[in-house]
Amino acid sequence: MNRNPANVSALTADWAWANPDGESWLTRDSQPAPKAKVRVIEGDGARRLGHEAKWDLLSPFLKQHGREGIAYATLQEGMEYFIAETGYIAYTRVQHPLLARRPKRIAFSDPICAPEDLPDLIRSFLDRDRRAAFCVISEPCAEVLRPMGFKVNCIGYEPLIPIQTYNTQGNWKELDLIRRARNETRRGGITIREEHEAGLSLRREELEALSAKWVASKKINDREIWLYARRPVFDHEKGVRKFVAYDHQHRVAGFAFYDPMYRDGKVFGYSANIVRCDEQRFGRLATALHMEAMEKFKSEGKESLNLLLAPFGKLDCGHFNDDWGAKLFFKLSARFG
């Protein structure tokens, strides 16, 4: 997924449909959006918002309702915002000379609000842009969107690991991958530790170099796929946990950054939003990083680790596959890459 809407549209549910009778686009949902104060931040205004300013503005909603794995990522650079009294919607605008001559708003993730406020917040957003679309949303959010005229398709699933009961040491039966990862780190003299602002600053050049090497090793290596796997930030970010792996020569071998997931003002789990390793030298290091982080989170009483979107996986398990063309495209993508 990227800023090319030819790609984005294949992964989103675009509700804009033909209406030969000329009826209002709200006809499909008979409940009009209530009038409420809203704030729209786009363009230069959005670009000028730093992390601290975004946190001050949006964290009251995020800390109460940021329960999804990519909720925290709505604070990242490049997002624009529709903010109401009950919550906010983060989105990006895309444009294409043929497919979207006018900028098209692609809402990123579930709206950040209480479940009961979701319909009205979405209606209010659509009241200002009926061409908007949504991507990487949960099934409860999809259930709200479908009566409004959206088509919805499953694009994958998010693996959720129960932190308190999961065997982070592995075994040679069901969890041999974990055991092998643990053994690899021991043989390689790998040390994994959580780093804070000072440690990140000291290792910034190494972290950036490893990140660039990781991107270069991928099939799509000319840009970051930043919407559902955000760009790494090698500075302090409120609530984000950052674990770094070092080889026996004390060089950076990999890192994993975990975004907090919030419920009712408290962190109940984390999402593995950024994981990058020297895969040529340490093929199982990402697993070892996750297990080390989970042990720390377990001691703190956290509940869940979200490994985030596995694109095109378990498509038939999704409740919604409204567009057969999109479903076929996703299945072909899963098969042929």
Which sequence ranges carry the predicted segments?
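An acidic, glycine-rich, mixed-charge low-complexity segment common to nucleic-acid enzymes
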Residues: 9-29
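Short hydrophobic short-linear motifs embedded
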Residues: 11, 38-43
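A conserved beta-strand-loop-helix scaffold within acyl/acetyltransferase catalytic domains
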Residues: 41-106, 135-155, 166-180, 184-323
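Glycine-rich phosphate-binding "P-loop"
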Residues: 105-115
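Inter-domain linker/hinge segments that demarcate the starts of reverse transcriptase
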Residues: 121-122
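Short active-site oxyanion
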Residues: 129-133
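Acidic, Ser/Thr-rich peripheral helices and adjacent loops at domain boundaries
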Residues: 317-337
